[in-house]
């Protein structure tokens, strides 16, 4: 007895694989991370639980998000210097997330949305870093 795999296409139908780039996916992941962070910053400001040094009124926050979204655009570039710049930035931001942010993430900020934003934001940064490392190594992903 031989097994025949089921297909969802009619016989003779040609299916072409969709392709994409690491840069496009990294950019999308970074835009999602920074958008979530912006939403949380606005939420914390409106709720009065923000870190006073990082609010919608401070130049630090505006600068951070301008650079973050700029890095998301830079992630689409194919040059090695751009790839290294993005990975260097991600290393710095992850260092801040792991070593500095816990010192200012006080009881007042530890809301359900605060924890959600923190965990998802860091997860997205780690995902972007993984994609960036694979891209820098010139790893090609193929369907199994």
Task: Name every feature range the model reports, one short phrase each.
Residues 20-32, 80-89:
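Interfacial segments of alpha-helical transmembrane regions
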Residues 19-28, 122-144:
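Membrane-water interface at the C-terminal end of transmembrane alpha helices
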């Amino acid at each position: 007895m031989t097994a025949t795999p089921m297909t969802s296409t009619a016989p003779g139908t040609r299916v072409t694989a969709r392709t994409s780039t690491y840069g496009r996916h990294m950019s999308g992941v970074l835009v999602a991370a920074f958008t979530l962070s912006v939403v949380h910053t606005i939420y914390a400001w409106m709720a009065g639980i923000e870190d006073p040094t990082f609010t919608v009124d401070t130049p630090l926050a505006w600068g951070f998000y301008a650079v973050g979204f700029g890095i998301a655009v830079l992630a689409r570039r194919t040059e090695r210097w751009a790839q290294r710049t993005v990975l260097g930035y991600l290393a710095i931001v992850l260092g801040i997330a792991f070593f500095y942010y816990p010192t200012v993430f006080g009881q007042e900020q530890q809301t359900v949305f605060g924890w959600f934003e923190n965990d998802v934001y860091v997860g997205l940064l780690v995902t972007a870093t993984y994609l960036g490392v694979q891209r820098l190594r010139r790893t090609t992903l193929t369907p199994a």
